[in-house]
Amino acid sequence: MQNNEQTEYKTVRGLTRGLMLLNMLNKLDGGASVGLLAELSGLHRTTVRRLLETLQEEGYVRRSPSDDSFRLTIKVRQLSEGFRDEQWISALAAPLLGDLLREVVWPTDVSTLDVDAMVVRETTHRFSRLSFHRAMVGRRLPLLKTASGLTWLAFCPEQDRKELIEMLASRPGDDYQLAREPLKLEAILARARKEGYGQNYRGWDQEEKIASIAVPLRSEQRVIGCLNLVYMASAMTIEQAAEKHLPALQRVAKQIEEGVESQAILVAGRRSGMHLR
């Protein structure tokens, strides 16, 4: 699984340079002159000025009338405000799942809650030689039938869990029957919390040949997603899968959590103390 895919078109040099200047201005408290930016970037002063004037015209930088330096404007915050948790998770998880695939061989998915189901945001199914599905991104995984769904229910806040179960229980059909059996469901969720992972062994009607284990992804003491490992049920039991692969899943989950936390701190820092003058 590669971090950077080959593209059909050449890199737009002007865009690359403009982004480089934005990054430099963010690191230089109090702004920077054309000369300093030219020195740091290695670009000609005329090129730097032209790029800055373009960014100024678009509203991302402004020129200080007092010392002729350039500084970021508040508009740059808009570049990250539309980036939701699931997008951070997907971006951070992709390279980590690639490394995980080489270790566990079986495919893994990162999913997040979408109303009444878990939605796959990132996956290694298309890269795993043991995968039985190639197109998984965007697929909805039922909460009561999959390891990821049960993991979410097990580790989410109690009030959230109660509301989700009530919603599922109100729906007709066998897919939601478990929500109408509170003692049975709570035993399943309690076991997941005790063992640190959720499980599914041939429990999903649409995928009767598969089994899976999943661990929660947390940020600021809340569940933001789940990381699962999917395999052919005939290959091993849940206990064997956990013994063999749970440590790797937990390690990668922690790495994803640390990445999300770092991004959250970075975004918060930019919002509260970004070098906007």
Swiss-Prot record:
GO BP annotations of the record are: catabolic process; negative regulation of DNA-templated transcription
Task: Give the molecular function GO annotations.
Answer: DNA binding; DNA-binding transcription factor activity
Which InterPro entries does the entry link to? GAF-like_dom_sf, HTH_MetabolicPath_Reg, Tscrpt_reg_IclR_C, Tscrpt_reg_IclR_N, WH-like_DNA-bd_sf, WH_DNA-bd_sf
Annotated HTH iclR-type domain ranges read 12-74
A Pfam family of the record is IclR_C
Which gene carries the instructions for this protein?
mhpR
Residues of the DNA-binding region: 34-53
- SUPFAM superfamilies to which the protein is assigned, alphabetical: GAF domain-like (SSF55781), Winged helix' DNA-binding domain (SSF46785)
Q: Does the keyword Transcription regulation apply?
A: yes
Q: What is this protein called?
A: DNA-binding transcriptional activator MhpR
What keywords would UniProt list here?
Activator, Aromatic hydrocarbons catabolism, DNA-binding, Transcription, Transcription regulation
Where are the disulfide bridges? Answer: none
Per the UniProt entry, the signal peptide is none
* IclR-ED domain: residues covered: 89-262
Function, please?
Activator of the mhpABCDFE operon coding for components of the 3-hydroxyphenylpropionate degradation pathway.
